[in-house]
Amino acid sequence: MTKKRLVLWDIDHTLVDFTELGAAWYGTAFTAATGATLRVHPVFGGRTERATTTDLLTANGFEAAEETIQALFKALVAESERHSPTFADTARALPGAAEALAAFAADGDVVQTLVTGNLPEISRHKLAAFGLHEHLDLEIGGYGTLSVHRPDLVPHAVALAAAKHGTEFGADAVVVIGDTPNDVRAAVDNGVVSVGVATGHYSAEELRAEGAHTVLPDLADTDAVRNAVRNTVLS
């Protein structure tokens, strides 16, 4: 019997490219949430939204109180909602992303969801612009609201997937796919498989140095992506 696998996808620079778009929302969202003007801009790089928001508030002279964090989350979702009709024109799905997702969706032994620093609503907006959401179970993802530490998102998603599908996913059956060292560490810290994709700001060598078990140049070769998910072994 074929082993059931759980594939946990990153979004930005793995499946889609929204370069600079998200950063532009923060000025409006910050003012809506705090009444102040944003002076110090956020740093992303595979971090969770909770980490980004916490540091953003502190850097701009505000206490990172939960009420303020939630207000900023709400304002960011509103900005994403407002701009979402233009996403298909201002952003892009990365080569091979749709094909890889569709290939795994056609396999009865693969469950696909997200481990992403994005907020749940923004995740859907970004993916829906290119029809990518159709192949993912977004209800069982690990999102950036949960923790400042990205590795915390992995067991959350695994637990939700196990409960929904009635399957215990062993460490070698959980595959995290992403483009940053933070994606790699999220997998390695939880003892699961890391597949790095060098489609962002980090080279294949940098991802391997962080401990990625397999590194792909991109998602363009669907067979290579499927092979990485099915045949990569933990070392």
Question: Residue locations for each model-derived region?
Answer:
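Conserved H-loop
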Residues: 63, 133-137, 213
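Active-site neighborhood of HAD-like aspartate-dependent phosphohydrolases
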Residues: 1-45, 51-59
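Acidic, Mg2+-coordinating phosphoryl-transfer loop and its flanking beta/alpha structural elements
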Residues: 176-214
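Short acidic-hydrophobic, aromatic-tinged amphipathic segments that line or gate anion-handling sites
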Residues: 142, 214-219
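Substrate-recognition "cap/lid" segment bordering the active-site pocket of phosphatases
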Residues: 113, 118-175, 181-190
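Short, acidic loop-to-helix structural element flanking the phosphoryl-transfer center
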Residues: 8, 82-114
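Non-catalytic pre-domain segments flanking phosphatase-related domains
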Residues: 1-9, 55, 60, 64, ...
